[in-house]
Amino acid sequence: MAVYGRILRSPRIAILVVATTLARLPFGINGLAILLFVREQTGSFAVAGLTVGALALGSAIGAPLAARLVDRRGTAMLMPLALVHAASLLAIWGLGLAGVPSIVLVGLALIGGAAFPPSGSVLRSRWPQLLGDPELVRGAYALDSSLIEISFVAGPLITAAAVAFAGPEIALGLAAVLVIAGTALFLAKLPASPAEDRHEAHRGLLGALGHRAIRTIALTTMPVGFCIGTIEVAIPAFSDAQGSAELSGVLLALWSGASGVGGLIFGIRRVRHGLVQTYLAIAVLFPLACLPLAAASAPAAMAALVMLSGLPIAPLIASRNELVAAVAPRGTQTEAFTWLVTSLVAGLAAGNAVAGAVIERDGWPAAVMVGVGAAAIGAALALSRRQTLMPSPVPAG
């Protein structure tokens, strides 16, 4: 683990890591907080679900555009985005209490999702510049993927604590404060990017997706998200079948924790293969690690199997990020990383929806198998398009 100490002792790095963690905690807070708040104010789970769906839709549509704006105009654009995002959360709070029509809350959530500042993507695009040493850069991508897992676990816990203390509106207010404070701290400590990167930004309609490697990685990321989404729903269904609804929280925490541990271990490995080979190997390993979940018959067995299936998740994300850093054209790196987040989240949403329908008809093991099948198709697609993943011999840009 010495590599992580070296990373965090590098100039500015520890503060930048803290800042991005604070800035993206709202990503884990907002969904549950908005769901609970809108449900409380309107009395309708349907309206609450529609509002959360609008938040996700706004993120899916707006995040790549926001990232392209940052690539072309510079990181100073992060703060206006953070302010719009925070304002939308506070408006949902204030107008929700005032009893405005539900469509207003849905619209505000759509705006808030679209304006979420991509500080994490910016930092991922800067690791090579900030650290230089390839060993430290590899470790930084692994550390980042593990911290993402922590954010997804901590966000709902923060919301739950806020609800227990006062109400879901407090979680919305906290999320607004965190996104502004984290973004401000991030911008204060982030060195300026090379000016030529913005001059070389692709002006085409597709932006980062104009590069074939980015298209392949985005395309093969979606089935991974789909598999994760099906398992997210299958685990609570398994717990319900065992007669212990609270078991799902423990299992999901073990799953995320194992992913974080896997990411940290991945970051200190010795490099024996190239970026493409590493990414493809973990892409193949992931569905194989998830497959045994469908055979779990008792809580202890499921606990062991969710940890097994979680181990490759953060390494897969980290290896993917390393590859993107190597192949993304100059001036499009922030957008490239954001497209991958969008692909993952889109896959998650689809996996959640499909798993619910499959569980109703065929049970939770069938949902796991559907997710594993999707991940296997994604791995096969990556293998079949491996030549598109090779860094171009001609300087990109």
Predicted segments — roles?
Residues 2-60, 208-253:
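Helix-loop boundary and gating motifs at the non-cytosolic
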Residues 61-75, 163, 262-275, 359:
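Helix-to-loop junctions at the C-terminal end of transmembrane segments
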Residues 84-100, 285-297:
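C-terminal ends and interior cores of transmembrane alpha-helices
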Residues 110-148:
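Cytoplasmic helix-loop-helix junction between adjacent transmembrane helices
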Residues 117-131, 235, 315-328:
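Intracellular juxtamembrane helix-capping segments at the cytosolic ends
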Residues 164-177, 357-375:
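A membrane-interface helix-boundary motif in multi-pass transporters
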Residues 276-318:
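C-terminal transmembrane helical hairpin of 12-TM major facilitator-type secondary transporters
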Residues 331-362:
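A late C-terminal transmembrane helix in Major Facilitator Superfamily
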